């Protein structure tokens, strides 16, 4: 009876105003429909129509995502290049190369994520808050930082990643010295 799949166009059309969908097998759909039949979600029908008229079908969604890829791939390439070349050899951070999505999750040395974000901010680079992927932003290891490269220009991103990598290494060195 699994999986139950959820998706949204929130990041690909209008942030906060996308259309969400759910897919499941017939048995799960019966249970879900029964459980939620008395709730009123008050869908924005005009917004749904906008999305249908814009995308038309799955091929329209795929074509639109290809446009996103043309814009985002060079930005993700910059992020990954800096991580691999500057931070990777030091061992003070790990990350996964995303296969889609809009973020790169970086795990810096335990106990340094907030410091990295602070150092970046002091240098003029604003990041998503440390631990933002955790409930209430509470990362028990203070190690997770989510990089969102979609907004800055390529030149801005190059500079921002240089600063991020220096801040990551500096915070790690300071943490090591604290523990000596």
Q: Where in the sequence are the language-model features?
A:
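Conserved core segment of the aminotransferase class I/II
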Residues: 2-73
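Inter-domain helical "communication" segments and dimerization helices
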Residues: 33-34, 53-65, 84-85, 89-94, ...
């Amino acid at each position: 009876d699994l999986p139950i799949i959820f998706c949204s166009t929130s990041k690909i059309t209008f942030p906060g105003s996308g259309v969400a969908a759910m897919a499941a097998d017939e048995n799960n759909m019966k249970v879900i429909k029964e459980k939620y039949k008395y709730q009123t979600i008050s869908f924005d029908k005009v917004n749904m129509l906008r999305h249908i008229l814009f995308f038309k079908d799955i091929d329209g969604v795929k074509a639109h995502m290809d446009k996103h890829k043309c814009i985002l791939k060079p930005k993700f390439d910059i992020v990954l290049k800096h991580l691999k070349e500057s931070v990777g050899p030091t061992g003070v951070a790990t990350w996964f190369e995303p296969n889609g999505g809009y973020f790169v999750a970086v795990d810096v040395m335990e106990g340094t994520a907030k410091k990295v974000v602070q150092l970046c901010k002091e240098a003029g680079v604003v990041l998503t808050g440390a631990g933002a992927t955790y409930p209430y932003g509470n990362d028990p290891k203070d190690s997770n930082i989510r990089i969102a490269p979609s907004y800055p220009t390529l030149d801005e991103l190059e500079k921002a990643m240089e600063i991020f990598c220096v801040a990551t290494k500096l915070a790690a060195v300071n943490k090591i010295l604290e523990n000596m």
